[in-house]
């Protein structure tokens, strides 16, 4: 009974394998750059496979330290977005209460919880945007009164055309509203 009245789609957000992978790779690479730069400054081999006497501190060692620090900062930033689960949440379409609820986690602070609620009567249509090319975009939007369009698909790896079509059609049928393609 509740399945007929409530649909809930979970959104993964930043806790994707690719983010774990890139955070780890950037951390290892940046650590290597920083240790190599410090090795050239101290004239001590901090890494067993690097010969510090072959690297002059100014300018090569200094630049390597700079890139290492930048990489570590970026790696920590990516790690924190994973830890805080930024972008994850759910889309809930509730016929029982007559509400559409879009919930996402943001960065810590005053607006950490992004919680949008709309009456089902305010939802006018479902719009699908398909853009092919080098960076394809396949997005489903919820069109709400007041010319607002709220994306309800996940960010990251684009969904297949079949997945987009199926999810948009199911949602439009469930909400009994129009579906159009841009």
Swiss-Prot record:
Pfam families: Ycf4 (PF02392). It is a multi-pass membrane protein. It is found in: Plastid, Chloroplast thylakoid membrane. The chain crosses the membrane at residues 22-42, 63-83. Keywords: Chloroplast, Membrane, Photosynthesis, Plastid, Thylakoid, Transmembrane, Transmembrane helix. One of its GO terms (cellular component) is photosystem I. It comes from the Eukaryota. The keyword Thylakoid applies. Its main location: plastid. GO terms for biological process: photosynthesis. Belongs to the Ycf4 family. HAMAP family: Ycf4. NCBIfam families: PRK02542.1. Seems to be required for the assembly of the photosystem I complex. This is Photosystem I assembly protein Ycf4. It comes from Oltmannsiellopsis viridis. The lineage of its organism: Eukaryota, Viridiplantae, Chlorophyta, Ulvophyceae, Oltmannsiellopsidales.
């Amino acid at each position: 009974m509740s399945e007929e009245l409530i649909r809930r789609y979970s959104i993964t957000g930043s806790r994707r394998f690719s983010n774990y992978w890139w955070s780890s790779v950037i951390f290892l690479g940046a650590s290597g750059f920083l240790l190599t730069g410090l090795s050239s400054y101290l004239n001590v081999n901090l890494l067993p496979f690097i010969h510090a006497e072959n690297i002059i501190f100014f300018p090569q060692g200094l630049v390597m330290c700079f890139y290492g620090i930048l990489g570590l900062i970026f790696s920590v930033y990516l790690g924190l977005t994973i830890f805080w689960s930024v972008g994850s949440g759910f889309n809930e379409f509730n016929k029982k209460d007559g509400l559409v609820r879009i919930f996402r986690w943001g960065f810590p602070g005053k607006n950490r919880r992004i919680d949008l609620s709309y009456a089902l009567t305010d939802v006018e249509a479902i719009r699908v945007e398909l853009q092919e090319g080098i960076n394809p975009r396949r997005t489903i939007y919820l069109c709400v009164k007041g010319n607002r369009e709220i994306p309800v698909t996940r960010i990251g790896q684009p969904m297949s055309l079949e997945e987009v079509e199926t999810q948009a059609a199911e949602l439009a049928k469930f909400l009994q509203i129009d579906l159009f393609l841009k």
